[in-house]
Amino acid sequence: MRRLALKIDVDTWLGTRDGVPRLLDALERNDARASFLFSLGPDHTGRAIRRALRPGFLGKVSRTSVVEHYGIRTLLYGTLLPGPDIGRREASMMRSVRDRGFEVGVHCWDHVLWQDRVGARDAAWTREQMRLAVERFGEIFGTAPRVHGAAGWQMNEAAWPLERELDFEYASDTRGAHAFRPVDAEGREIGVPQLPTTLPTLDEMIGLHGVTADNADARLLALTAKSSPETHVYTLHAELEGGRLGNVFERLLRGWRAQGWTLVGLDGLFASLDARALPAHRVAVGTVPGRSGTLAVQGDTDAGLRP
């Protein structure tokens, strides 16, 4: 059986409040499962302005019309406006995802803080950020999270073993080609099994190489039409596919089903694997076409199919 796992990153209050219910409806209409990974603390999206000097960031912003997708108000949270506490305000919405049969997991505590700072922070800072997220998850759901997916695919050396210490069973923190066991230079396992994102995201594709919202689904479906590999992980965003790119996502769901893919969450993909038999790979720092900056990638593989 060919399995394509849908990983939904929920970055903002707006995405949680408005994007999540739209995605739930779309998934149910198309008999698809998915994993929703939540940002559980404050929405400080406005502080992402610090990325303006990062090579490629302003180009990505202009290509994907950030204001159109996120709205002015969200882009002021954490700067001119106080950042709403997402987990406090939207606990019932998050529980509704679980109650409708979808996997829920941890994305982060503070999305912008983690994505922009984790690479330079120490173990104590990292532990505190992950502790806050795990504790809030427990308050909302009454159980411990099984899956972690790092904001912006950003990690540091301390975060890998912390996932195991905090009893995550598997994670999707990286970009890569297939599931693997992360190891250090000596071949020692450093964390839980990784289910990396294998396909490009819409915001990486649109605006480059002639890709638009009208043909992005066709470009992605061309990548998944091949007979191999038999598994993929696609990351989508509640603010994009749960917003103005909802029609693109619906076309993708229909197209994947027509190609014979079973659409699962990360839990469904992990359950189909023998975790002990997964190949070992080091985690590297690399780049992905269409995304600014560096991120965690599976070593010795292509970190993401090009559109």
Segments from the language model and where they lie:
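Positively charged, amphipathic and often flexible ligand-engagement surfaces
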Residues: 194-211
